[in-house]
């Protein structure tokens, strides 16, 4: 509670499903960021739908109805996953990463979206898209989400029909078109690390320019 009497909830960030237990023990009032890229790392192939479903639903159950914000695959930049065969780029932080990669590799993306839709039946899960720059990216992601819903319905599988979908605001472009993004998103999360880095053109890991960061 702030001095002015405003109550602020304290959420935890997690990288793996098992991390949720530490969050609960330490009194987290929700999960503000589940970094799902860690599910894809240190292995030879992408996790399947059922494996992802188990991971996401276990976190939702452990949080007992409290908010769980799950970020879709945020690959690229400094997050290299060998079997995804992303071509080497001159500047990977400005290249094919995060939502850009997922929208180009829709089958991989849909596996994750299907797992999230199914897992959301077991708690208060919300989906968050990383590195969004344009409203078109959100619209395309929502279209894929609707495709997944139709597929799950046809297969007779249970899923949450009204799942919330938001974005990470972590580029100057997203800030400039925030009003338009708000019209197609259910919520915003401010990604201060990348937003500061892109705004100041400064690498937070570079001591020579750390004064800018």
Question: What residue spans do the PLM features occupy?
Answer:
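Conserved alpha/beta-domain cores
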Residues: 2-213
